[in-house]
Amino acid sequence: PKTFGITSPISLAAAKDTDCTLMQKLIETLKPYGVFEEEEQLQHRILGKLNNLVKEWIREISELKHLPQSVIENVGGKIFTFGPYRLGVHTKGADIDALCVAPRHVDRSDFFSSFYDKLKQQEEVKDLRSVEEAFVPVIKLCFDGIEIDILFARLALQTIPEDLDLRDDSLLKNLDIRCIRSLNGCRVTDEILHLVPNIDSFRLTLRAIKLWAKRHNIYSNILGFLGGVSWAMLVARTCQLYPNAIASTLVHKFFLVFSKWEWPNPVLLKQPEECNLNLPVWDPRVNPSDRYHLMPIITPAYPQQNSTYNVSVSTRAVMIEEFKQGLAITDEILLGKAEWSKLFDAPNFFQKYKHYILLLASAPTEKQRLEWVGLVESKIRILVGSLEKNEFITLAHVNPRSFPAPSENMEKEEFRTMWVIGLVFKKMENSENLSVDLTYDIQSFTDTVDRQAINSKMFETEMKIAAMHVKRKQLHQLQPSHVSPKKKKHSFEGVKLLSLNDSSIDLSVDSDNSMSVPSPTNATRTSPLNSSGLSQGNSPAAPVSFSVTNVQATDVMVPQNNSTENLGGSLNESIPESATHPGFSSTPKPLVTRVVSSMRLVNQLQKPVSNTITKMPSPVAGVKRTSSPSNEDSPKKNKTEEDENDSSISADVDDQNKLETEELKEVHSEEKSSSPVPGSLPFSQQSSTDLSDISVVPATPIPVIKNSIKLRLNR
């Protein structure tokens, strides 16, 4: 039999009747969440139309460039799909990722001019726009109601045959870097499908895992969690280790494998291949920066890249804890003690932590807000990385979902978006008081955002960032009912957080269904924050028994600097490490200052100790999630014969898990001997090049307004 993956499988066991029953229950549980696409025929028809348009356009270009008639008749051209649609896990309302492949005589400029014009002439095409200067250039459109993103790649071929296999590495020869990036999505997707033993089982398992990740707020590559392709590769590796298992078993094995995975050992679906094309590939033996990646998941197509280079100490700790919780729940499901719905219950993020940082991005128009929010969000992981390096902070957990916030000044139109970061502070055994100054951490973040805004020439007047600290109980004072727990029937409307001189800051949040994660259609509709469990009555034990007595929060406005030269780089490019911790300029006066309670300055502004993190911490312990099984949940009762049977079954599951854990260690041993593994080095967040062609941003600081958050924590 064919072996999948770089190691032998853990188990070849086939599905039992109970597994099939559980799989049917899983399918029924998934249906209300809209994870199964209902418009497949429409999408197939639209892609067929698009494919015909591409062929027609390439023939026209060929005639304009006076190619021989014999070549024109067979010139070809083709639309390929990639991402969730190609993997077969496309969800309702999601867009389709497509790639236009053209022969060598068709230029990228042709794609963004004549093909763009051709699309504009189609009645079915709406909302047409091109982003030619993006890291991966793209044309976006809505075709007959279906959102489509089209990339472009020109191959060094005279014609494009219908049976072209993009996995052929020789196709990459003599291509520019933008074409290689554009091809990468299709090549990775196709490789994944060729490396799993059973595509149907893979697809159903991936649908379940993606829904679980979104519901548990750990689905976001840009914020340091995992994106779609990374989740697909983890599921594919699980399928390789259990080639005969069906989805109900694979979901459980997924949590078993990755709750016990020995990070930073990389996840590989196949042995990396050498192609001698001189392209940068992930290899910690050669590239020092690759040794610092915490959770490497390596794409199977050349040039191999780490799809999770954004993962930080905190995001990895959060994900590993979620893997462990997923294992505990699926153990219960296999024992018949829980239903699949429990796995997809959204955890209570807004009750989980005692301290939070709120980030607010605002702009004077909706169009500017969209651009500004995109930039700020792409850099939040830098703030998380800076916070987790603070010697007093154990964990910084950003909620991947942002929320709309109303304008602070009702007389002036303003569009605002808010993100929430949960903090766990270190417990100090020999100190009654703990003074924490987060000014430097916030300043580093705002410096980076400001630099990028000016470099990319997207900055507009009145674009602002605000950051402030709030305690868990203050979150409940926000205006909308979907932020406050529904314990009382009276409205919280009009309640605002108190600040200096009787001024106030209104952090109320409007509902925005477009921001919400999938939720069952037959359940009561809730707003985004509600779906995260904020309305649940029981709050878990606070991670830290500190209280905040002193808080300062300052709005930050990007300065207008018309004389600043273009320092290079684009909106979607990675920022070098040197740019994430810029030096400070002289302190200008803040535009607006707000202080909660009287302020006693503690800790002068200084850089945090650089070597506070010298090893990769284990997942945070002691934080009880709302869905965690607890001994307090059920009172003790006399043991019956049924209980003894349950205990026997439970012991069998535990024994099986332990046995497979030992086999998993053997898998790690095999992988260590056959793959490059990062060395044991001190943690230092590094930017991945990821086929990047960015220029280094100079370290000269751009003057910005200081954003000060200083806390006095009492035990």
Swiss-Prot record:
<feature type="binding site">
    <location>
        <position position="219"/>
    </location>
    <ligand>
        <name>ATP</name>
    </ligand>
</feature>
<feature type="binding site">
    <location>
        <position position="95"/>
    </location>
    <ligand>
        <name>Mg(2+) 2</name>
    </ligand>
</feature>
<feature type="short sequence motif" description="Nuclear localization signal 2">
    <location>
        <begin position="624"/>
        <end position="639"/>
    </location>
</feature>
<dbReference type="InterPro" id="IPR007010">
    <property type="entry name" value="PolA_pol_RNA-bd_dom"/>
</dbReference>
<keyword id="KW-0460">Magnesium</keyword>
<feature type="binding site">
    <location>
        <begin position="95"/>
        <end position="97"/>
    </location>
    <ligand>
        <name>ATP</name>
    </ligand>
</feature>
<feature type="binding site">
    <location>
        <begin position="82"/>
        <end position="84"/>
    </location>
    <ligand>
        <name>ATP</name>
    </ligand>
</feature>
<comment type="similarity">
    <text>Belongs to the poly(A) polymerase family.</text>
</comment>
<feature type="binding site">
    <location>
        <begin position="228"/>
        <end position="229"/>
    </location>
    <ligand>
        <name>ATP</name>
    </ligand>
</feature>
<protein>
    <recommendedName>
        <fullName>Poly(A) polymerase alpha-A</fullName>
        <ecNumber>2.7.7.19</ecNumber>
    </recommendedName>
</protein>
<feature type="binding site">
    <location>
        <position position="91"/>
    </location>
    <ligand>
        <name>ATP</name>
    </ligand>
</feature>
<feature type="compositionally biased region" description="Basic and acidic residues">
    <location>
        <begin position="655"/>
        <end position="673"/>
    </location>
</feature>
<dbReference type="Pfam" id="PF04928">
    <property type="entry name" value="PAP_central"/>
</dbReference>
<keyword id="KW-0067">ATP-binding</keyword>
<feature type="binding site">
    <location>
        <position position="97"/>
    </location>
    <ligand>
        <name>Mg(2+) 2</name>
    </ligand>
</feature>
<keyword id="KW-0694">RNA-binding</keyword>
<dbReference type="GO" id="GO:1990817">
    <property type="term" value="F:poly(A) RNA polymerase activity"/>
</dbReference>
<dbReference type="InterPro" id="IPR014492">
    <property type="entry name" value="PolyA_polymerase"/>
</dbReference>
<feature type="compositionally biased region" description="Polar residues">
    <location>
        <begin position="515"/>
        <end position="539"/>
    </location>
</feature>
<feature type="compositionally biased region" description="Polar residues">
    <location>
        <begin position="674"/>
        <end position="692"/>
    </location>
</feature>
<feature type="region of interest" description="Disordered">
    <location>
        <begin position="560"/>
        <end position="590"/>
    </location>
</feature>
<dbReference type="InterPro" id="IPR011068">
    <property type="entry name" value="NuclTrfase_I-like_C"/>
</dbReference>
<feature type="binding site">
    <location>
        <position position="149"/>
    </location>
    <ligand>
        <name>ATP</name>
    </ligand>
</feature>
<feature type="short sequence motif" description="Nuclear localization signal 1">
    <location>
        <begin position="472"/>
        <end position="489"/>
    </location>
</feature>
<dbReference type="GO" id="GO:0005524">
    <property type="term" value="F:ATP binding"/>
</dbReference>
<feature type="site" description="Interaction with RNA">
    <location>
        <position position="310"/>
    </location>
</feature>
<dbReference type="InterPro" id="IPR043519">
    <property type="entry name" value="NT_sf"/>
</dbReference>
<keyword id="KW-0479">Metal-binding</keyword>
<feature type="binding site">
    <location>
        <position position="210"/>
    </location>
    <ligand>
        <name>ATP</name>
    </ligand>
</feature>
<feature type="compositionally biased region" description="Polar residues">
    <location>
        <begin position="560"/>
        <end position="588"/>
    </location>
</feature>
<feature type="site" description="Interaction with RNA">
    <location>
        <position position="140"/>
    </location>
</feature>
<keyword id="KW-0539">Nucleus</keyword>
<dbReference type="GO" id="GO:0005634">
    <property type="term" value="C:nucleus"/>
</dbReference>
<comment type="subunit">
    <text>Monomer.</text>
</comment>
<feature type="site" description="Interaction with RNA">
    <location>
        <position position="135"/>
    </location>
</feature>
<feature type="binding site">
    <location>
        <position position="95"/>
    </location>
    <ligand>
        <name>Mg(2+) 1</name>
    </ligand>
</feature>
<keyword id="KW-0547">Nucleotide-binding</keyword>
<feature type="binding site">
    <location>
        <position position="149"/>
    </location>
    <ligand>
        <name>Mg(2+) 2</name>
    </ligand>
</feature>
<feature type="region of interest" description="Disordered">
    <location>
        <begin position="510"/>
        <end position="543"/>
    </location>
</feature>
<dbReference type="Pfam" id="PF04926">
    <property type="entry name" value="PAP_RNA-bind"/>
</dbReference>
<keyword id="KW-0507">mRNA processing</keyword>
<keyword id="KW-0464">Manganese</keyword>
